[in-house]
Regions:
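C-terminal catalytic lobe of FAD-dependent flavoproteins
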Residues: 373-448, 452
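Mid-to-C-terminal "cap/lid" subdomains and adjacent gly/pro-rich loops that border
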Residues: 36, 45-87, 248, 256, ...
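Conserved redox-cofactor binding core of oxidoreductases
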Residues: 57, 61-90, 100-103, 107, ...
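A conserved FAD-binding loop/helix module that cradles the flavin
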Residues: 509-527
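Core beta-strand elements of the Rossmann-like FAD/NAD(P) dinucleotide-binding domain
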Residues: 2-3, 275-284, 288
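Conserved beta-strand-loop-beta-strand element in the redox core of flavoprotein oxidoreductases
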Residues: 257-279
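A glycine-rich dinucleotide-binding beta-alpha-beta segment and adjacent secondary-structure elements
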Residues: 90-95, 210, 215-222, 256-259, ...
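N-terminal glycine-rich phosphate/pyrophosphate-binding loop and immediately adjacent elements
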Residues: 3-141, 305-338, 521, 525, ...
Length: 551
């Protein structure tokens, strides 16, 4: 049966929904997007580098696309850049009106970029464990096929190792690029002391990356933006979607209201170029504006919104490791390495690998120099700094949402019919108990792995900094009472039968493993089931939007 659909956004979930819907020629898809892009001059510089031998790279062009972010004067992980640009975070209206009274709270939580935050992600692509879905209304057996379908779209570089027992590989893959000497040393020691380390509840394995690894040149620029564009971005999927004849893409639009009129779903937008407002209608609306962006739309559009909602987060922490045995200086002439996460340490507190902390371990990249203590950055301390860099590994760790502080989102009416203002706060400021338990396990395993955590230098990132957040409108179990802050398995709130939330906002829980692959798989599941005729209950229009311009 033919149908028309609106898709809000172009990030991971929106791209997967648009691809799924548009794969049916009888379905017409209109994508409404802010569509922020890399600046023209940086795009030109990138094109000068792409496909050329690195020895012939223009230093000026290289400098333009590898510029580091300016220090903000605060302790913590700096805002990431891609090709020297902050365009994924640039405010085109999507973060205006977001605030927090708590220092350190991340407010760069909605992307304006074409492709969303996949332009700056770490490319880790792992499913949630089977046991995570015991707390969901959707079982692992249902999700597995959608993980596989997602990995048909996302290139995976991975190895079959001990992590596969909990996180199956699920699909074809390429091998990772050669690992750096520190990663190889840790993995060799893990193999030699495997029984001892596993007895402590730790599993060590290679990274799982959304990367076309077979073309990787190991130029070392992963963290500033791959010059060959080998790291997956949802923009790549959207590029493919936009070439289909049954897809219309509209950018420079800020969606401000969503709802239903009669048997049609409605999205009301503001044109960024003209300031004029327009209304789009279709049979169904799929909202993939990111967890906070979608939450904001719902709170501003619902007939009787709650004054506040709770958002789950897989809280991030940063842990530096030192090793007794040094490797070669990572800055030595001719050194080649890829700088994405190279190996993972899973710390498990149960037999089912549900209560876990997941640590992604990164090799050297130039940002480490600026993060060294001030005395080590002095020229007179260059030998000491070199000694540290030959031993240093940085881990980005995550806790599951049920062991992490929650974020309270409070809404206030916006101005002139625009988006509501939001206040983000994390009332619980205590260090999560699981973090301490994780560090103790890592210390106990350190002699076997020669990977010694520095507990005194562990940083618990501010609320929202992990970017693994959502669950404001979680899927509820079948038969559970419907309320204004839960959705059915197709992402529908009780008042809208034709509006589907499809991003992280509907995840019931967030495991400690990275969640982008799960967000994409769940979005694919929703779109696939809707196309198959599910989620077609009686229409109950609630929100009537004034038509200023119909499309």
């Amino acid at each position: 049966m033919s149908g028309t659909h609106l898709v809000v956004g172009s990030g991971a979930s929106a791209a997967m929904v648009a691809l799924t819907l548009a794969s049916r020629p009888d379905q017409h898809v209109t994508v409404l997007d802010l569509g922020g892009r890399l600046e023209t001059e940086r795009r030109a510089a990138l094109q000068q580098l792409a496909g050329r031998d690195e020895a012939s790279w223009d230093p000026v062009a290289l400098g333009a696309v590898t510029a580091a972010p300016a220090p903000r004067g605060t302790r913590g992980v700096p805002q990431k850049r891609t090709y020297g640009s902050d365009y994924p975070f640039r405010d085109l209206g999507q973060t205006t009106g977001l605030r927090s009274r708590q220092p350190g709270t991340n407010l760069d939580v909605v992307s304006s970029a074409y492709g969303g935050f996949t332009n700056v992600w770490g490319a880790q692509a792992m499913p949630f464990s089977r046991s995570t879905f015991d707390g969901w209304p959707i079982a692992w057996q249902e999700m597995e096929r959608h993980y596989r379908a997602t990995l048909d779209e996302v290139s995976l570089a991975a190895e079959d190792d001990d992590l596969a027992g909990t996180f199956p590989l699920l699909n074809r893959r390429s091998r990772l690029p050669p690992l750096g000497p520190r990663a190889e040393a840790v993995l060799q020691r893990y193999d030699a002391h495997r029984e001892r380390v596993r007895g402590l509840g730790l599993t060590v394995g290679r990274a799982r990356l959304a990367l076309r690894a077979d073309a990787c040149t190991r130029c070392g620029l992963c963290m500033t933006g791959c010059p060959h564009e080998l790291i997956y971005s949802a923009a790549q999927t959207m590029d493919r979607v936009r070439r289909l004849p049954n897809v219309t893409y509209r950018d420079r639009l800020l969606v401000e209201r969503i709802g239903q009129v009669g048997d049609q779903a409605v999205a009301r937008c503001r044109d960024l170029a003209t300031g004029e407002r327009a209304e789009f209608r279709a049979d169904r609306l799929f909202v993939g504006a990111g967890s906070v962006g979608t939450t904001r739309l719902v709170l501003g559009s619902s007939a009787a919104p709650p004054s506040r909602v709770e958002m789950a987060e897989s809280r991030q922490f940063v842990v530096p490791f030192l090793s007794a045995r040094a490797v070669e200086d990572p800055r030595r002439p001719g050194a080649r390495d890829f700088t994405l996460n190279q190996f993972n340490v899973l710390v498990s507190f149960d037999e089912e690998d549900r209560d876990t902390s997941h640590v992604h371990c990164y090799p050297y990249n130039p940002a480490y120099l600026g993060a060294l203590p001030a005395p080590l950055r002095h020229p007179a301390a260059s030998r000491a700094a070199t000694s540290v860099l030959r031993r240093l590994t940085v881990g980005f760790g995550y806790l599951p949402s049920w062991a992490s502080p929650r974020i309270t989102v409070t809404a206030r009416r916006g101005r002139s019919g625009g988006l509501p203002e939001l206040d983000l706060s994390a009332p619980d400021t205590h260090r999560p108990p699981m973090l301490g338990a994780t560090l103790r396990r890592l210390v106990r395993a350190a002699p076997a792995l020669d990977l010694w955590p520095l507990p005194t230098h562990v940083l618990l990132s501010g609320a929202g900094k992990s970017y693994h957040f959502g669950g404001t409108f979680p899927h509820r179990r079948e038969g559970a009472a419907a309320d204004g802050t839960s959705t059915d398995r197709w992402g529908r709130l009780p008042e809208w039968d034709r509006v589907h939330l499809v991003d992280g906002s509907v995840l019931p829980t967030i495991a400690s493993t990275t969640f982008t692959l799960t967000v994409m798989a769940n979005a694919h599941r929703i779109a696939t089931e809707v196309l198959a005729g599910a989620g077609t209950g009686p229409v109950r229009p609630v929100v009537e939007l004034t038509t200023e311009c119909s499309r």
